[in-house]
Amino acid sequence: MASVCGAPSPGGALGSQAPAWYHRDLSRAAAEELLARAGRDGSFLVRDSESVAGAFALCVLYQKHVHTYRILPDGEDFLAVQTSQGVPVRRFQTLGELIGLYAQPNQGLVCALLLPVEGEREPDPPDDRDASDVEDEKPPLPPRSGSTSISVPAGPSSPLPAPETPTTPAAESTPNGLSTVSHEYLKGSYGLDLEAVRGGASNLPHLTRTLVTSCRRLHSEVDKVLSGLEILSKVFDQQSSPMVTRLLQQQSLPQTGEQELESLVLKLSVLKDFLSGIQKKALKALQDMSSTAPPAPLQPSIRKAKTIPVQAFEVKLDVTLGDLTKIGKSQKFTLSVDVEGGRLVLLRRQRDSQEDWTTFTHDRIRQLIKSQRVQNKLGVVFEKEKDRTQRKDFIFVSARKREAFCQLLQLMKNKHSKQDEPDMISVFIGTWNMGSVPPPKNVTSWFTSKGLGKALDEVTVTIPHDIYVFGTQENSVGDREWLDLLRGGLKELTDLDYRPIAMQSLWNIKVAVLVKPEHENRISHVSTSSVKTGIANTLGNKGAVGVSFMFNGTSFGFVNCHLTSGNEKTTRRNQNYLDILRLLSLGDRQLSAFDISLRFTHLFWFGDLNYRLDMDIQEILNYISRREFEPLLRVDQLNLEREKHKVFLRFSEEEISFPPTYRYERGSRDTYAWHKQKPTGVRTNVPSWCDRILWKSYPETHIICNSYGCTDDIVTSDHSPVFGTFEVGVTSQFISKKGLSKTSDQAYIEFESIEAIVKTASRTKFFIEFYSTCLEEYKKSFENDAQSSDNINFLKVQWSSRQLPTLKPILADIEYLQDQHLLLTVKSMDGYESYGECVVALKSMIGSTAQQFLTFLSHRGEETGNIRGSMKVRVPTERLGTRERLYEWISIDKDDTGAKSKAPSVLRGSQEHRSGSRKPTSTEASCPLSKLFEEPEKPPPTGRPPAPPRAVPREESLNPRLKSEGTPEQEGVAAPPPKNSFNNPAYYVLEGVPHQLLPLEPTSFARAPIPPTTKNKVAITVPAPQLGRHRTPRVGEGSSSDEDSGGTLPPPDFPPPPLPDSAIFLPPNLDPLSMPVVRGRSVGEARGPPPPKAHPRPPLPPGTSPASTFLEEVASADDRSCSVLQMAKTLSEVDYSPGPGRSALLPNPLELQLPRGPSDYGRPLSFPPPRIRESIQEDLAEEAPCPQGGRASGLGEAGMGAWLRAIGLERYEEGLVHNGWDDLEFLSDITEEDLEEAGVQDPAHKRLLLDTLQLSK
């Protein structure tokens, strides 16, 4: 029995049939969930080990904890439970024998194995495959030259001898023999295979036997044809095909049924390539031999690309009202961009029809500053004289024109850059379900991103991209023919001979990657893979293909998939995705502990995902006719599943502004053909966005989606081709000018502490593994030195600095380290299995003081907890030199005053993704989160929310770090010298948004010394939860354009996974493992002890230490990032009884009514819209003068301190504040256990406090 994962088959260990307690490919988290639902001591199951191929894991529930034992095979295929040193090993031939022994008491396990836990199996109906896994009915294909179809020889006239194996009536040679075989299989053996699949089998032995018997004659015939074609090929090509030779030699070797089928498929593939290429070889050979044949024109190996013509843009100068009065009317300019010449010409038309023009070379254009509020406004900083700059703000015709102008200037900068290697490249992604029909001759609109949605401007469509990636499904064209078609189309379009990097196929699912000739030598470590997701992951027409490679120092991954079809098959599509995520073998083999979503700097996932719309067909058609897509996006299955964290955890997708791409009437884009005749009856296929492009990038990297749409003129298929173009930052293969690091100038990565909250019912110890390309080898920590849990489903584990290694990067240059990332995996000591993985960017960790990070853990595509810590990257002072990247040249200006403002808030383009670490300010800690929602902004007419504002570089606004050439200055004002501080290169905050502080409590570490002061410590800023769908502000908010808005707004870095509307958030000062839950109320109505609200603090009273004040700030912060409580809610339906005086953490779903409403896929929950930001600033200004830092109610720390002094218990004030009870308004809900945690141990004092609070109610 073959294993899907490629691991040794457990068939021998399991016997003839898999028992009910064995679960193939079950994840650790799912196993714990099954055991938690069983709920009885002695419940057990066996699953495949995640850490050792061919091994098993025995999971046992005892006292609500899951204990895991590894079952390892030895050299003689005997099985044994891994034991401690000195304990005798017991060997077993099968798992059944092993389970039988340990079902008896006192055999060394934590308890006897009493109750086997079976999996939740949902048998498919017999006609299920007809409904979802069979290709759609297609019209007959027209005859083509080089056809890949092959007839099966049958009938008594065949010269081949009959096979010697016994024949059955199903295999008789009749004109319809294969149909008879299919009929016999469905009548008899189908049920046996179905039972085998239910029992955990990964293959279909009876179907395999039937297919082998039916295709045996085809084997012989194909061998004959291949032999003849090989001889013919030798005549013309003078060389034989090694693949054909090897296939013919393997024919004499004994093969199993599955091997025969695989061999047949491979032969047919080779035969297809032979048939498509034999005519070209013959023609070339005959032309060479014929003296009368005209010589073929010599083609250069690399043709020069078409030159980009000079492009002109009509703009108006943006001036103040006073300047407009002086001038008389707005000035009109023409901006001419000469990419080839490296010049920008400003042409001004004057009243007397004279023209005044000024030319700026590329090196005198210092910075472009995009206005965020006015989408068609752009500031350009010019160099007038040495160290003097001038900024001019221009208003373009539309936001799309502004984006085209920026792209041309970036291309000009890149073309004339003195750098040997590029900082940024453009990537084209295309996906198309071709419907098993050959493509039309002209697919230029797909290649050039023309059509519906967010398309490129006509000025930039002809600019060639650096990398083209084409993913197709139901592509009946041969691999070589398809590749030639793509290269020919690109050559005709760009005059460049693009180089194929990789081509991978699985059935009719194909992915092809082509790059510019100049980049061919920058590509390395190419890898390809495929995964089948059909019946039992072995047969069917669905699956995925993938390609990965390194572009200099940046890793790329591309996955093209075709998932299960059918409106009702959402769960199966989700499982398809998880199978691909786990089984696709791409990227660095040393990162096998991580799934492919964490192996690459940039991962693009696209294809026919087949997620549909859950809405009545007539409603869908009405919305489409009115071009109202927002209501449809709310019921899009992919959006809903991502919101539930089921698939594509923390992936991003650009805003969808084009109509559904499926299912059109072939030959037209005016009509959706939503009726389909199936063998089981008429099916309804509602119009849907089946074809999608998503991506996931490491934090603190640069990626912008410039277009996302579909064509409207390619009509051969019932799907429309979809395109997306991306601007991606890349790194070079860094070579230090100072050579390798010596001991004296070595860089160090040092950890002060790490804390993880892991979703598990296990109570084992854990360790952390650290991986990075900047390390010579991976490193391990010691086991954690502290752990605690107040909830059975979660475990808090902590490591102090003693348990954490000091990492030594291979290079110490900051320019190298700021592009590096650290991969972490939290593994258990008992089974060495991963409980969660994450990635941390080093850029924000560089400095002499420790910075804090916070991110989420995931495993097998599921969120499994979060991790936070304190670390620093120490870089020698002589290696601090760095340079500006090309993508840092364009900035975002949140301030609409433009050049009139002395210090506008500017965000560098390179800092699109920021880490969760930055220095807090007094303003940040003082703004209550509730203010964000006091004045909800009205939605735009289309129903789409405005995009969240970009982060503002706080460091730049307080202490500008821009270089002189990048700092917008007023004319005639000398730029100040640049200020560099590499203590933390990226402190970025959102103006007016309260920032949640989540520092590590020093007292939470058993062995970590409490620092004497927190003056220089940086509190963690928790990233706001958001669904990774990028939104651009709608035109109309300060813009006069009728066209698409241009700028793409990337998310903040460490983008947390999207939370559903029902998500519950924990305050950082409350332990997520012990937080009480209010029953019987909705979240919005709950009046239990919410987190104490932040408010302005009074001056430090005498004797108060900065550390205690910092803890008070922490206790008052509001944290909306952690979804641990939500994970606890969904982990299991078991409602464990709480301890005395404590509410249960897991509420009954029937009792906790969660608010539901229309999902907002674009706006992070904690990002205020622009107008709300202004009100926040006003509110902060009003709140600041409040006496004693209190609120209008007069309740606060001062009131609580006075109350404690009045009853003679002021000694407990510090402990209560430290635990978050700093407000009398919420102190009335404190429990006896909460008092104990705050340090109130005296029973008399506890009773006095509680009685006094009761009387004050």
Swiss-Prot record:
SMART domains: IPPc, SAM, SH2
EC number: 3.1.3.86
Activity regulation remarks: Activated upon translocation to the sites of synthesis of PtdIns(3,4,5)P3 in the membrane. Enzymatic activity is enhanced in the presence of phosphatidylserine.
Record PTM Phosphoserine, positions in chain: S132, S241, S353, S891, S1132, S1256
Pfam families: C2_SHIP1-2_2nd, C2_SHIP1-2_first, Exo_endo_phos2, SAM_1, SH2
Membrane topology reported for the UniProt record: Peripheral membrane protein
Main location class: cytoplasm
GO biological process: actin filament organization; apoptotic process; cell adhesion; endochondral ossification; endocytosis; ERK1 and ERK2 cascade; establishment of mitotic spindle orientation; gene expression
SUPFAM superfamilies on file: DNase I-like (SSF56219), SAM/Pointed domain (SSF47769), SH2 domain (SSF55550)
CDD domains: INPP5c_SHIP2-INPPL1 (cd09101), SAM_Ship2 (cd09491), SH2_SHIP (cd10343)
Positions of post-translational Phosphotyrosine modification: Y887, Y987, Y1136, Y1161
Biased composition (Basic and acidic residues): 119-132, 952-966
Keyword annotations: Actin-binding, Cell adhesion, Cell membrane, Cell projection, Cytoplasm, Cytoskeleton, Hydrolase, Immunity, Lipid metabolism, Membrane, Nucleus, Phosphoprotein, SH2 domain, SH3-binding
Stretches assigned to coiled coil: none
Signal sequence extent: none
Region Disordered: start-end pairs: 119-181, 897-986, 1004-1115
Gene Ontology molecular-function annotations: actin binding; inositol-polyphosphate 5-phosphatase activity; phosphatidylinositol-3,4,5-trisphosphate 5-phosphatase activity; phosphatidylinositol-3,4,5-trisphosphate binding; SH2 domain binding; SH3 domain binding
Modified residue annotations for Phosphothreonine: T165
Subunit structure as annotated in this protein's UniProt entry: Interacts with tyrosine phosphorylated form of SHC1. Interacts with EGFR. Upon stimulation by the EGF signaling pathway, it forms a complex with SHC1 and EGFR. Interacts with cytoskeletal protein SORBS3/vinexin, promoting its localization to the periphery of cells. Forms a complex with filamin (FLNA or FLNB), actin, GPIb (GP1BA or GP1BB) that regulates cortical and submembraneous actin. Interacts with c-Met/MET, when c-Met/MET is phosphorylated on 'Tyr-1356'. Interacts with p130Cas/BCAR1. Interacts with CENTD3/ARAP3 via its SAM domain. Interacts with c-Cbl/CBL and CAP/SORBS1.
Family as reported in the entry's similarity comment: Belongs to the inositol 1,4,5-trisphosphate 5-phosphatase family.
The protein's name in its UniProt record: Phosphatidylinositol 3,4,5-trisphosphate 5-phosphatase 2
Organism (species): Rattus norvegicus (Rat)
